[in-house]
Amino acid sequence: MNINDIFLKRKKRWGIINRLRDSEEQADGSLTPSRRIALISDDKSFRELYAQVKTGNPNSFPGYEQKVEANRLKTGQQDAVVTGTCRIGGVKTAVAVMDKRFLMGSMGIAVGEKITRLTEYAMKRKLPLIIFAASGGARMQEGLFSLMQMAKTTAAIEKFKDAGGLFISYLTNPTTGGVSASFASLGDIIIAEPGALICFAGPRVIEQTIGQKLPEGFQHSEFLLEHGMIDMIVDRKDMKQTLSKILKMHVNTGGEA
């Protein structure tokens, strides 16, 4: 058996495993993009966009290509976000779902490009936009190119909102680093899952820096709701119903979908 046969065999095996995993929650309680999309979208309404967008290795970081390929095999995704359109309660919506299984959902060139393209697509077609964030932050291996995605996605979202678009940011566990400091914090409505860690730097880093113990639950969704940083906490079983209500209110008050 040559190396190509081994590679294809591994790819097929991972594909079977991923299809089985996609029907359930992960061991840590997180949802795969396909499972989350299935929970929120009307039956067979999802259409993926920009699946062909891939990252490179702009800094020639040793071993990066191999790590990316391993994560592609493991997840069945090209990168750490799935983008497309679906109907939620009958309302056509642009949706992005981040995948923390893929290099901890880190944002690099491909993630920034896909989110930016989807935002521009939603603006052109006057669709509401929902992004489910799940990320460890900017992708270290892509360096400055990764950090540039913070400004790029932020600019796209602000342009979308200035044009009258509705942006719902849905924060899941964890939403941290450069993602929390960019588009994830810009929602017209910001929703979080119960118990989600939402921060820039983690609590351990902050405690080591300031030399003080942080309050109980600091940087979790309940703490942020209590202090006015997010608008609501919604359990997964209520995801579709809540989003459907918000989207229908938007349509009924003059928004387009």
Curated annotation (Swiss-Prot):
Its EC number is 2.1.3.15. InterPro entries: AcCoA_carboxyl_beta, Acetyl_CoA_COase_Trfase_b_su, ClpP/crotonase-like_dom_sf, COA_CT_N. PROSITE patterns: COA_CT_NTER. Coiled coil: none annotated. Pathway: Lipid metabolism; malonyl-CoA biosynthesis; malonyl-CoA from acetyl-CoA: step 1/1. Keywords: ATP-binding, Cytoplasm, Fatty acid biosynthesis, Fatty acid metabolism, Lipid biosynthesis, Lipid metabolism, Nucleotide-binding, Transferase. Belongs to the AccD/PCCB family. Acetyl-CoA carboxylase is a heterohexamer composed of biotin carboxyl carrier protein (AccB), biotin carboxylase (AccC) and two subunits each of ACCase subunit alpha (AccA) and ACCase subunit beta (AccD). The gene is accD1. It catalyses: N(6)-carboxybiotinyl-L-lysyl-[protein] + acetyl-CoA = N(6)-biotinyl-L-lysyl-[protein] + malonyl-CoA. Component of the acetyl coenzyme A carboxylase (ACC) complex. Biotin carboxylase (BC) catalyzes the carboxylation of biotin on its carrier protein (BCCP) and then the CO(2) group is transferred by the transcarboxylase to acetyl-CoA to form malonyl-CoA. This is Acetyl-coenzyme A carboxylase carboxyl transferase subunit beta 1. Its main location: cytoplasm. It comes from the Bacteria. GO terms for biological process: fatty acid biosynthetic process; malonyl-CoA biosynthetic process. Residues 1-257 form the CoA carboxyltransferase N-terminal domain. It is an enzyme of class 2 (transferase). GO terms for molecular function: acetyl-CoA carboxylase activity; ATP binding; carboxyl- or carbamoyltransferase activity. GO terms for cellular component: acetyl-CoA carboxylase complex. It is found in: Cytoplasm.
